[in-house]
Amino acid sequence: MNNPRGAFVQGAEAYGRFLEVFIDGHWWVVGDALENIGKTTKRLGANAYPHLYGGSSGLKGSSPKYSGYATPSKEVKSRFEK
């Protein structure tokens, strides 16, 4: 008999190894999910409220020179004016 330990001890060790892997795996998955949720929330917030995140425009790569409101290039006439 090479291993004098009983079945209960071996079962407890096996269960402990299983539980360790199970809990470690779940922490990994939950941690990744929370990280991705945080990044997505930040990105959506920056797109919706660019002034809160230090940007002047909601579109990435937009030039400060051309951002802002559009200006008409010709005279604007009302459709219902007589």
UniProtKB/Swiss-Prot annotation:
Residues 55-82 are annotated as: Disordered. The gene is csmE. Residues 59-69 have a biased composition (Low complexity). Belongs to the BChl C/E-binding protein family. It comes from the Bacteria. Component of the photosynthetic apparatus. The light harvesting B740 complex binds bacteriochlorophyll c. One of its GO terms (molecular function) is bacteriochlorophyll binding. The keyword Glycosyltransferase does not apply. It comes from Chlorobaculum tepidum (strain ATCC 49652 / DSM 12025 / NBRC 103806 / TLS) (Chlorobium tepidum). This is Chlorosome protein E. GO terms for cellular component: chlorosome envelope.
